[in-house]
């Protein structure tokens, strides 16, 4: 028996496209309007700042000679594949998990595109307090973090199946 597309979590793949459009659009605007290192204050504690990340989160392995580009690309592809299979196996009604998976896939694909096209990930969000600056990040990173937080949150919510048995 085959599942219909709309009955599975794949129904939420449209969110992947939304994340990709917003992420790649923001990166395009930065690349077109900023020189590397340029900073524009937006609000107190928030700047737009063009940075290149050759590594992973917090520039992990950024200075490792180039092999990390392909390593992180492989990890991103693997994660996207696993989460897509999980969405296929999930019911469309499992909204929280499917939305979380879609956010993570969209963010991973946005950063994967950067890695493969440019050789680095474009980062532009600079959050700071006083002289302390958090690592510069982008909207794809935000989507991945929100998705991961939603998965953790889902683990703390009561299970609907457990409620029916009680």
UniProtKB/Swiss-Prot annotation:
One of its GO terms (cellular component) is plasma membrane. It is a multi-pass membrane protein. PROSITE patterns: SPASE_II. It is found in: Cell inner membrane. One of its GO terms (molecular function) is aspartic-type endopeptidase activity. Its EC number is 3.4.23.36. The chain crosses the membrane at residues 12-32, 70-90, 102-122, 142-162. InterPro entries: Peptidase_A8. It comes from the Bacteria. Pathway: Protein modification; lipoprotein biosynthesis (signal peptide cleavage). This protein specifically catalyzes the removal of signal peptides from prolipoproteins. This is Lipoprotein signal peptidase. It comes from Enterobacter sp. (strain 638). The gene is lspA.
